[in-house]
Amino acid sequence: MQITGRFTIAVHIITCIDYFSPDHQVTSGFLSASTGVNPVIVRGVLSQLKEAGIVNYRQGASGVTLNRPLDQISFYDIYKAVDSVKDEGLFRFHEHPSPDCPVGRNIHSAVDGRLDQVQTAMENEMKEIKLSDVVQDVREQITKEH
């Protein structure tokens, strides 16, 4: 599969923005410390989230804010913003099956449609998962710590 760590970094970032924004200036350095990820990567993810209209972010400015309510941000929105597989598809198929082999000649036609079904099902499920649910779970877990 071709979903990278950028997806979970983005979920972490958005959760931090919501949790800390009322009391703290949320900067890329702050987010880097929370995620344990290099600030350059954090800024790259923030730029992608900004381009998708999920956050408001200007490098060197007064912090990062959310552009829309958490219940209007889905896992799918984040996936499309930072990790969308675009035209190549979620699954990477080996490129050179042998045309001299009967299986090699026919494997693509037997498998491609099914892989597309799996990707569509995953994307549809991602559309149902909202960041408001993630943040609620994180807040409940933090409350239990105290």
PLM regions with names:
Residues 1-14:
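Short alpha-helical segments that sit at the start of domains
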Residues 52-67:
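Beta-hairpin "wing" of winged helix-turn-helix
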Residues 92-146:
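C-terminal regulatory/oligomerization modules of transcriptional regulators
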Residues 70-96:
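Conserved segment of winged-helix/HTH DNA-binding domains
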Residues 46-52:
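Basic amphipathic alpha-helical segments that dock to polyanions
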Residues 38-41:
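Short coil turns linking two alpha-helices in DNA-binding domains
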Residues 13-20, 81:
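Short amphipathic alpha-helical elements of helix-turn-helix/winged-helix folds
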Residues 26-35:
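A short alpha-helical element within helix-turn-helix/winged-helix DNA-binding domains
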